[in-house]
Amino acid sequence: MASLALTSPPSVKIPSYLSSSSSSLFSRSSISFRTTESRSRICVSGYAKCNLPKALNGNARVPIINETTIPKFFDSSRLEKSVSRNNTKLKLFSGTANPALSQEIAWYMGLELGKVSIKRFADGEIYVQLKESVRGCDVFLVQPTCTPTNENLMELLIMVDACRRASAKKVTAVIPYFGYARADRKTQGRESIAAKLVANLITEAGADRVLACDLHSGQSMGYFDIPVDHVYCQPVILDYLASKSISSEDLVVVSPDVGGVARARAFAKKLSDAPLAIVDKRRHGHNVAEVMNLIGDVKGKVAVMVDDIIDTAGTIVKGAALLHEEGAREVYACCTHAVFSPPAIERLSSGLLQEVIVTNTLPVAEKNYFPQLTILSVANLLGETIWRVHDDSSVSSIFL
């Protein structure tokens, strides 16, 4: 019987790609941190802005993010005091899907991960045992339902059930990547709406609330009969783009398909109301996309393609090829969830994309690293959201 025990060491080391000396492969968000000697909440102290050195090709370099577009991560003295006196009513546990992200969240919050033993039996069954009391506690379980999707989903359900049976006061499922989110409607006869089924399973297991990052479609929130906090990862990516010193006059935001226009429009609005272009495509099968034509002007521009998921990368790469054909100077791909199913890496590293910017909502295997890849951490965003949910404070104000 294989086993995996997830515990927190007495002191948490900051991951290398969160430090100021991060490698070129792992470029973190330009959010900076301040810490104190005692274990306390880590707070955001500022954001990097575009420098204003001199004009480039006749266009002044101006910040593409201003003070009104930056989320105000608030300092709560009450919460900090709570942590400093070892608040036992807030518990954070990690599943096995993305323990690195869970540890970063705990580091941001000034907490230690709860102790839990997760085992795999020889026949594939999953066993979960909490190694500390959660009676009367506000419990948050961090577990993206990424590959292997069914196994990680089942693990989450069993963790929720274990917390409920251990008399936790509230159980929140923190799902950075929500598997089956793309199965949110019927496109052909006799199909299942698996996203609704998964929502039912999580609810019936005993979860009181769900936190999810950049759901494929907004209507998925309505599939749950419990509250859902939709965490938008745009601030992390926007902050990183601000550090690129791209002239706002040279920028165009591109939606890789018609279905993502609303997402791209919201993204463009934050980039000084950058112009919008749309790639029109026709899908002939699952994981197969064909680019048809481009709506909008990208000639001589820096094109930023915005999507929620990169799976096989067919949509992104074919879109990038079309943008180059239409005269785009550079093409960037910005995506929250890096699924990277084969042959995604071969396509993304082919040279069509200047940079592929993703987040760590699900782990990226080392074998899938390539020179153009940049991974940003959403730990701050999730940690702040968890604090606000625990404190009964506004979550939506983070993204306004």
UniProtKB/Swiss-Prot annotation:
Recorded GO CC terms: chloroplast
Keywords: ATP-binding, Chloroplast, Kinase, Magnesium, Metal-binding, Nucleotide biosynthesis, Nucleotide-binding, Plastid, Transferase, Transit peptide
Protein name in the entry: Ribose-phosphate pyrophosphokinase 2, chloroplastic
Principal subcellular localization: plastid
The protein's Enzyme Commission number: 2.7.6.1
InterPro entries to which the protein is assigned, alphabetical: PRib_PP_synth_CS (IPR000842), Pribosyltran_N (IPR029099), PRibTrfase_dom (IPR000836), PRTase-like (IPR029057), Rib-P_diPkinase (IPR005946), Rib-P_diPkinase_bac (IPR037515)
Binding positions (Mg(2+)): D214, H216, D225, D229
One GO term of the biological process aspect: ribonucleoside monophosphate biosynthetic process
HAMAP family with a match to the protein in the record: RibP_PPkinase_B
Domain of life of the source: Eukaryota
Reaction catalysed by this enzyme: D-ribose 5-phosphate + ATP = 5-phospho-alpha-D-ribose 1-diphosphate + AMP + H(+)
Record organism: Arabidopsis thaliana (Mouse-ear cress)
Regions crossing the membrane: none
Enzyme class: transferase
One of the record's GO molecular function terms: ATP binding
Residue range covered by the transit peptide: 1-44
